[in-house]
Amino acid sequence: MCTEWQSWRSGRLSCELGHEAVGVVVDAAQSNRLKVGDRVIVMPHAGCGVCPACRSGEHIHCTSQRDLLDETGSSSGIGCYAEFLLKPDYLLQAVPDDIETHHAAMAMCALGPSFTAMHRMQVSAQDTVLISGCGAVGLGAIINARTIGARVIALELNPYRAALAQELGAELVIDPRAPDLIEQVRAVSGGYGVDAALDTSNNEGAPAVVLELLRARGRLAFVTWSGSLPVNRITGKGIDIFGAWHWNHDVFAEELLQRVRDARPLLDRLTTHRFAMSEVASAFALQETGNCGKVLLYPGKIAQA
């Protein structure tokens, strides 16, 4: 489960509940890639498959998303809160036998966006990385950074998630409202600021704040949809900026699946709650409190880890 609870809270009608899933192929008409019985990671959205973005594996950035309303009941072909889903085979990634289903599910929003962000920023074990916002995506970013070997500083308001961030390997978690935020970050990053930062907070004011926590010639990535940046500070500090949404299916599938293998103990800590699909309202209510990590939803009976 990801951000769908926000529609539940607001009462906004949506036919797109669920945009990350792992399932089993029950029919594979006209597919040479998959067969009945294969476990697959279900990619979000419904890329056309023919535009330049899709041809390069960047289906999430498709310039002509297919309208699958008639086929799936979802205008963007998501709708994973269901027992069955129709999806083009190029938007399904086979899951190797040695990866458990609940771990494979983490390859989407839990790890995917920040995996791309870390790759684009070329994060290494020598870096100190700041993660702004410790929702499920931000917590997954901590896992990605720690698995790489980087040192992690995190910003988070919610005490539950701040504690979970430390369990996952953040060396220091700071309340972003702290009046001495910049001083605290610089004190643990050589006096100059962090090497790289990722904002996942979706807070309007966060981007400009995070920018000031970077050293000169630092790297900044966003998995968020809110906020703005002062161009004069970007230029003045010589900051490299990246946008990251999801991972390239053609280029990074094997590398991301290996990341899932390497991070399994941390992914188990990240997964804090499991619900049957019939309990989805309770799952939404929990997510609204913020007192959870990654929440898994199961059709029918809850599977045990």
Predicted segment positions?
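Cysteine-cluster motifs in flexible loop/terminal segments that predominantly coordinate metals
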Residues: 1-5, 34, 43-93
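Glycine-rich beta-strand-centered segment in the early N-terminal region that forms part
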Residues: 6-55, 96-99
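Residue-level marker of beta-strand positions
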Residues: 20, 38-39, 53, 84, ...
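Mid-domain Rossmann-like dinucleotide-binding core that forms the NAD(H)/NADP(H) cofactor-binding site
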Residues: 90, 97-178, 183
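Glycine-rich cofactor phosphate-binding loops and adjacent beta1-alpha1 units
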Residues: 121-122, 163, 167-242, 281, ...
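C-terminal hydrophobic helical "lid"/dimerization subdomain
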Residues: 208, 212, 253-305
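Rossmann-fold dehydrogenase core element
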Residues: 219, 230-270
